[in-house]
């Protein structure tokens, strides 16, 4: 088995020898996917590489005004020649690359950089560390092996990546190395207070309207350990809300005293729901989500299920209650 350090070196070597590189994040891009991709892209461009930044879905507004280079991210690969290397950032499931999945067989080399459990090795180099709380940590380590300086722009992107995927450093996966990396990033002079205000205190009013509608659906189980909420597409349409305006809602039920497991059901389109799972202490929600074709981390995961909301909720709530009983012993 190839060691982690050898994998990092192999990835650095492949990137160093390539002239043109495509970097792609996952559908419904978040701060870790975008921040990690942009940090790596800025670093590679400083090495003289031709870099194409790709996202299957639009970049949320809150990141466009915050992350350097975010306005350069494209939804299509608009070049006559396919780049030599394709790097999947924060994603090790081909379907989560959206329409870019269909281009994978056209690249000479494919690198996967991820930290989600249950991924698939669909590339030539598979750098997946499920112990890392964010892909941004892995990218930071990778940059130590490349001839680049971590400047303010790169540091800002990595700070956003790690900050957002660790719940502002509140989640279980945060480790001493996380804070050491953050210290290194802060030493470049990034405006940490300003970044956090823009991430968490500059939301459009529609976000609060969405939250208000979602909170009306809050349901806590008789045992007090399971809480769930949902939002349907017709409600989002009535509020003129986009999917990005729902981000962060998932964690609200978990803040209730005594609740171990939180579920959030979001209608994506007709009869397709994204279910987000969050746990506090002991329920392995990666295992729970895998029962429905999904996955993620022990304390945060998700899946997509097709059907009627009432049936999906009943099925998943039943499975969640079983998990609470079995894993709480």
Residue ranges and their predicted role:
Residues 2-27, 35-65, 80-85, 164-291, ...:
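Hydrophobic helix-and-loop "lid/oligomerization" segment in the mid-to-C-terminal part
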Residues 70, 76-124:
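Active-site cofactor/cluster-binding pocket
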Residues 1-9, 103-110, 131-139:
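An acidic intrinsically disordered interaction segment
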Residues 41, 68-73, 105, 128-131, ...:
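Short, hinge-like loop/turn segments at secondary-structure boundaries
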Residues 31-37, 94-98:
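Short glycine/serine/threonine-rich phosphate/pyrophosphate-binding segments
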Residues 113-181:
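Short alpha-helices
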Residues 75-78, 99-102, 126-129, 147-149, ...:
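A generic local secondary-structure boundary/capping motif
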Residues 28-29, 91-94, 116-118, 233-234, ...:
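Short glycine-rich anion-binding loops that position phosphate/pyrophosphate groups of nucleotides
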């Amino acid at each position: 088995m190839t060691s982690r350090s050898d994998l990092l070196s192999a990835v650095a070597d492949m990137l160093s020898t390539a002239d043109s590189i495509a970097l792609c994040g996952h559908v419904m891009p978040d701060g870790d996917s975008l921040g990690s991709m942009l940090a790596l892209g800025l670093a590679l461009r400083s090495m003289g590489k031709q870099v194409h930044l790709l996202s299957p879905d639009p970049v949320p507004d809150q990141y466009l005004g915050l992350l350097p280079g975010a306005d350069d991210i494209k939804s299509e690969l608009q070049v006559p020649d396919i780049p030599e290397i394709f790097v999947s950032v924060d994603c090790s499931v081909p379907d989560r690359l959206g329409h870019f999945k269909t281009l994978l067989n056209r690249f000479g080399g494919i690198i996967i950089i991820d930290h989600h459990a249950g991924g698939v090795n669909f590339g030539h180099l598979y750098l997946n560390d499920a112990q890392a709380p964010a892909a941004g940590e892995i990218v930071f380590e990778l940059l130590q092996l490349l001839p680049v300086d971590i400047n303010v722009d790169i540091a800002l992107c990595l700070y956003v990546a790690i900050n957002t995927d660790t719940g502002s450093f509140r989640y279980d996966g945060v480790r001493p190395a996380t804070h050491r990396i953050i210290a290194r990033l802060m030493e470049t002079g990034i405006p940490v207070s300003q970044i956090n205000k823009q991430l968490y205190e500059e939301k459009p009013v529609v976000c609060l309207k969405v939250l208000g509608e979602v909170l009306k659906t809050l349901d806590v189980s008789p045992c007090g350990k399971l809480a769930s909420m949902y939002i349907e597409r017709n409600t989002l349409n009535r509020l003129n809300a986009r999917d990005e305006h729902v981000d962060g809602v998932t964690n609200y039920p978990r803040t209730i005293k005594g609740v171990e497991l939180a579920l959030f059901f979001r209608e994506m389109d007709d009869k397709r729901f994204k279910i987000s799972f969050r746990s506090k202490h002991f329920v392995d929600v990666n295992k729970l989500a895998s029962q429905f074709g999904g996955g993620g981390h022990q304390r945060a995961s998700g899946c997509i299920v097709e059907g009627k909301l009432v049936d999906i909720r009943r099925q998943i709530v039943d499975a969640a209650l079983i998990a609470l009983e079995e894993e709480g012993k």
